[in-house]
Amino acid sequence: MRFLITNEVKSVFNDEIYLQRFEQIANLISIKLNIDKERFFECHFVDEKTIQEINRDYRNKDYITDVISFAFDDGEIITPLLGEMYICYQKVVNQAKEFGHSFERELCFLFTHGLLHLLGYDHIEVEEEKIMFGLQDEILNELNITRNVNGNKNG
């Protein structure tokens, strides 16, 4: 599975540092879920204003959120493009502090969460949530991306 990253945030954030982690996550999900390697998606890092506008305009929810995914598959027609996800940089920073773990862990969590939404996973129902969150934890733990403040199990 391939992806395109765009960084629309004017900050010191450099997504290139995390590109290797994103590749590891996408590859592991591809293997676990048997996703064709020709499928691809876009991930956009945006500011609070942009994500609130997207949330308001496309979801009728007028607030800042952390990640929004738009899956392009409708269940009948499968296209090479899985969809697009938008991650709010400032929410990554704030939530990492709030939850007491690293920026890397929060960023990778939201990337994984958004990608699973693109692949049809959801967490509206309790059973769906167990499956999706279980898979998220499995992926992140397998890659040693944990809730530890240093972002790994050993320190």
UniProtKB/Swiss-Prot annotation:
<feature type="binding site">
    <location>
        <position position="113"/>
    </location>
    <ligand>
        <name>Zn(2+)</name>
    </ligand>
</feature>
<dbReference type="InterPro" id="IPR002036">
    <property type="entry name" value="YbeY"/>
</dbReference>
<keyword id="KW-0540">Nuclease</keyword>
<keyword id="KW-0479">Metal-binding</keyword>
<dbReference type="GO" id="GO:0006364">
    <property type="term" value="P:rRNA processing"/>
</dbReference>
<protein>
    <recommendedName>
        <fullName>Endoribonuclease YbeY</fullName>
        <ecNumber>3.1.-.-</ecNumber>
    </recommendedName>
</protein>
<feature type="binding site">
    <location>
        <position position="117"/>
    </location>
    <ligand>
        <name>Zn(2+)</name>
    </ligand>
</feature>
<comment type="similarity">
    <text>Belongs to the endoribonuclease YbeY family.</text>
</comment>
<dbReference type="GO" id="GO:0005737">
    <property type="term" value="C:cytoplasm"/>
</dbReference>
<keyword id="KW-0255">Endonuclease</keyword>
<dbReference type="GO" id="GO:0004521">
    <property type="term" value="F:RNA endonuclease activity"/>
</dbReference>
<dbReference type="InterPro" id="IPR020549">
    <property type="entry name" value="YbeY_CS"/>
</dbReference>
<dbReference type="InterPro" id="IPR023091">
    <property type="entry name" value="MetalPrtase_cat_dom_sf_prd"/>
</dbReference>
<keyword id="KW-0690">Ribosome biogenesis</keyword>
<dbReference type="Pfam" id="PF02130">
    <property type="entry name" value="YbeY"/>
</dbReference>
<comment type="function">
    <text>Single strand-specific metallo-endoribonuclease involved in late-stage 70S ribosome quality control and in maturation of the 3' terminus of the 16S rRNA.</text>
</comment>
<keyword id="KW-0698">rRNA processing</keyword>
<keyword id="KW-0963">Cytoplasm</keyword>
<keyword id="KW-0862">Zinc</keyword>
<feature type="binding site">
    <location>
        <position position="123"/>
    </location>
    <ligand>
        <name>Zn(2+)</name>
    </ligand>
</feature>
<dbReference type="GO" id="GO:0008270">
    <property type="term" value="F:zinc ion binding"/>
</dbReference>
<keyword id="KW-0378">Hydrolase</keyword>
<dbReference type="GO" id="GO:0004222">
    <property type="term" value="F:metalloendopeptidase activity"/>
</dbReference>
